[in-house]
Amino acid sequence: MGGDDAPEVPVRAALSALTDGPEDLSILLVGDPDRLEPAVRDAGQPPERLRIVPAPQTIAMNEPPVQAVRRKPESSIVVGLRLQREGEADAFVSAGSTGAVLAASLFVLGRLPGVDRPTVGALFPTADRPVLVLDAGANVGCRPAHLHQFAHLGNIYVRDLWGVEVPRVGLLNVGEEEEKGDDLAVATHELLREDPELRFVGNVEGHRIIEGRCDVLVCDGFLGNVLLKFYESMAGFIVGLLRREQAQAGGRSREPGPVERMLDYTEYGGAPLLGVDGVVVLCHGSSPPRAIRNALSVAVDSVRADMVSDLGRDLEALSNRTRRGEM
């Protein structure tokens, strides 16, 4: 039960998902029952498919993630992931501390075979459909092999969840020519270009992202997080301008227009954590109910698509090819 407005916002999101979502969906709310039970009562009649699982400890946003996870085995993050590992849950969604979720996912679920570093994705709107950017901040100081794995993880995610049969994979770089960029970019470009399992479309410059040139865009987590934070601030700036312009023109409609909807991160739900042995979806700490509700949909779709099994098979095959010297 993490997030800036927990437990009220996650509870409202859960009830909305159970009301409007698939009939076979059930949700476990993990946290302090003394706080969760009143929030559930205040939000409306709780359905039978909602259950509260006690977790008396809480990890604050400013706590060192690894130490907090080790010191607090009964925190909602650790308990929730343990439920998935033990088969009582199929997925885990959290608006709590991103670092704590990452650390706990590694401790509790572990990595998939062949995965060196799990990666966090971020969805960016484009002129066509969203692009999945990997890594968005979980991994700083990557090697070419890490970015190669990110490309495979993103490739399977986009194929399974978006129905794109052969996703286009791009490499974020300072120029389109294959010799452009630092040593990491040049070496990664060669790996992606020579991989017959990927539809590599080459280097993608920052100003080309919104053109929809690729479905998966790989980069180091430092660069990806800077890109993410800039996009979030610019999207908020543009939405603010649109609303101010509407108000000055005497507009009264509060319905968001197509541009505002496209820039609204709540449209896309949460960010997937790919490469761990389970379904984990991360939400903004400030997420409103709608964003968490959409993140729950992402989790459901991931489970139905058996995405984790597909990721495991693909990354294990990549690891075997690498060991045989085929990459």
For the regions a protein language model found, what residue spans apply to each?
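Short, conserved active-site loop motifs that form the nucleotide-linked donor/cofactor pocket
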Residues: 49-50, 131, 198
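Glycine-rich phosphate/nucleotide-binding loop
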Residues: 106-133, 211-217, 221-327
